[in-house]
Amino acid sequence: MAENADDDLNSNLLHAPYLTGDPQLDTAIGQWLRWDKNPKTKEQIENLLRNGMNKELRDRLCCRMTFGTAGLRSAMGAGFCYINDLTVIQSTQGMYKYLERCFSDFKQRGFVVGYDTRGQVTSSCSSQRLAKLTAAVLLAKDIPVYLFSRYVPTPFVPYAVQELKAVAGVMITASHNRKEDNGYKVYWETGAQITSPHDKEILKCIEECVEPWNDSWNDNLVDTSPLKKDPLQDICKKYMEDLKKICFYRDLNSKTTLKFVHTSFHGVGHDYVQLAFQVFGFKPPIPVPEQKDPDPDFSTVKCPNPEEGESVLELSLRLAEKENARIVLATDPDADRLAVAELQENGRWKVFTGNELAALFGWWMFDCWKKNKPNADVKNVYMLATTVSSKILKAIALKEGFHFEETLPGFKWIGSRIKDLLGNGKEVLFAFEESIGFLCGTSVLDKDGVSAAAVVAEMASFLDTRKVTLMEQLTKVYEIYGYHMSKTSYFLCYDPPTIKTIFERIRNFESPKEYPKFCGAFAILHVRDITTGYDSSQPNKKSVLPVSKNSQMITFTFQNGCVATLRTSGTEPKIKYYAEMCASPGQSDTTFLEEELKKLIDALIENFLEPSKNALVWRSV
């Protein structure tokens, strides 16, 4: 690593005892410098040590990543709490240890590894390299590994786990996070993301296996081991074949005059959405040329999250206007989520929220089910949503007679529940989370932007034959099942103690262990606190949803029918808020509903979050 005498001298000094005055930190520094074989991340720690930056060293080395709503996720760079070669090796060693304990047939069934297109030059860290290291750890232990030979959408990994009957799988991705981040998303043999107790047990195993094993760094195994297989062609073919299960109007699709623009946000989605459109009988969607190929810097967008709306969809919307395309489809960088925009008659674009799209998907999937299975029992049918998402599916279910269930935030809970329902002979048509995560059908047990894009195109084409737009159909859905006006946004907060203070203040609002009874002028009917397991609406005051002690989440039900939730993000330094006014069918004064919702959100922010006092950063896009 060192190339001259000065570097050799520095290197020798660095391998002397580390006297920072903090024994825990000294131990962690020693471990990092002994174990890390990536020259760039090793050098980052050496430079911090050389410059006496003990606080940053402590921040990087004295804590570990934990499983959030989407696996392990952090910035790329040096340190035990970051995503890098060493922490991915450690995580995979822990995975191996846990899976070996759980599955006697681990060596027969194998493990799936996929990756997106992220990368960071300064730490020599890319999703592809991290995927190879993940595979190498397992290959060194004689585990068959199905390693995709190129980048794939995240849904391909859970799909492959089920198809190949593997014991588990990992997708290296940070989805729509900022370019600095990456992640390690774990799927169980069911094809659903891991939930408790697996996540806690894997973390314990990781902590027991922190020192890299002899061959864990040997990524040459990926090229030489006969146990490595490439599932790309087989899985892509089967996935596309399975898409036909949720395609209902292929002939109509092939004749449509509608044009679609698709952006893959510099990620993995382009090729796969093109193939999905082909399966559905469509002409290919028009790609946004500047965004169709992978770019780990996400050069043309302020942030790689299509959920942010018009500000990040600029190139797609302008191309659509030029091409006379009425609908824009945007998959996020790992293609597990979907944003949709439609050109309105007034010449403006309507970017649908996740909740609005869910209303359309819910109507569409149930309508298609009814037409295709006229004699089937509606009581066997289910739809699901996370508890912070719109209650529109609940309203549709009440009127149509099928079942609706809620889960904790995060698609891992939805996937796990769907698996249970399928095991009991139930039929699940659709599930969603408000952050533009949709699942049509059950071929994949995670959100899927590729299939959702094709389904939206089919829905739009079908409606177009009846001279109805997506926006007009959304209005019809609300007129039939009741208007559901919702607003979701967030504040950035980079100081965990501040976040804790905000939520503890709510729990002890006017006196110890007393939740607020009012939010400004709005009377609170019930409070549910998932962090503590409290729910004032239940006879025993205990939440029906599982307790989630590692995250903050409080839901308020107001006298006026509004439901609002404050929670911390499981993947980013955000405090999110969600609020929805649910009107009865026939109540069509949308102006009143919107004004009431706005007033309540203002009161929620002012009384509970106190952004000025707590130095919270308002959403900027």
Curated annotation (Swiss-Prot):
Catalytic site positions: S175 (phosphoserine intermediate)
Group of enzyme by EC: transferase
PTM-bearing positions, type Phosphoserine: S175
Pfam families the UniProt entry points to: PGM_PMM_I, PGM_PMM_II, PGM_PMM_III
GO-annotated molecular function: glucose-1,6-bisphosphate synthase activity; intramolecular phosphotransferase activity; metal ion binding
Catalytic activity: (2R)-3-phospho-glyceroyl phosphate + alpha-D-glucose 1-phosphate = alpha-D-glucose 1,6-bisphosphate + (2R)-3-phosphoglycerate + H(+); alpha-D-glucose 6-phosphate + (2R)-3-phospho-glyceroyl phosphate = alpha-D-glucose 1,6-bisphosphate + (2R)-3-phosphoglycerate + H(+); (2R)-3-phospho-glyceroyl phosphate + alpha-D-ribose 1-phosphate = alpha-D-ribose 1,5-bisphosphate + (2R)-3-phosphoglycerate + H(+); 2-deoxy-alpha-D-ribose 1-phosphate + (2R)-3-phospho-glyceroyl phosphate = 2-deoxy-alpha-D-ribose 1,5-bisphosphate + (2R)-3-phosphoglycerate + H(+)
Positions contributing to alpha-D-glucose 1,6-bisphosphate binding: R73, S175, D336, R337, E433, S435, K447
One GO process term, biological-process aspect: glucose metabolic process
InterPro entries given in the database record: A-D-PHexomutase_a/b/a-I, A-D-PHexomutase_a/b/a-I/II/III, A-D-PHexomutase_a/b/a-II, A-D-PHexomutase_a/b/a-III, A-D-PHexomutase_C_sf
Domain of life: Eukaryota
GO cellular component, one term: cytosol
Tissue specificity comment: Expressed at highest levels in the brain and testis, at intermediate levels in thymus, spleen, lung and skeletal muscle, and at lowest levels in kidney, liver and heart.
SUPFAM superfamilies (UniProt xref): Phosphoglucomutase, C-terminal domain, Phosphoglucomutase, first 3 domains
EC code(s) of this entry: 2.7.1.106
Record key words, sorted: Carbohydrate metabolism, Cytoplasm, Glucose metabolism, Isomerase, Magnesium, Metal-binding, Phosphoprotein, Transferase
Binding site for Mg(2+): S175, D332, D334, D336
Location of this chain's protein in the cell: Cytoplasm, Cytosol
Family, per entry: Belongs to the phosphohexose mutase family.
Function: Glucose 1,6-bisphosphate synthase using 1,3-bisphosphoglycerate as a phosphate donor and a series of 1-phosphate sugars, including glucose 1-phosphate, mannose 1-phosphate, ribose 1-phosphate and deoxyribose 1-phosphate, as acceptors. In vitro, also exhibits very low phosphopentomutase and phosphoglucomutase activity which are most probably not physiologically relevant.
Name by which UniProt lists this protein: Glucose 1,6-bisphosphate synthase
Organism, scientific name: Mus musculus
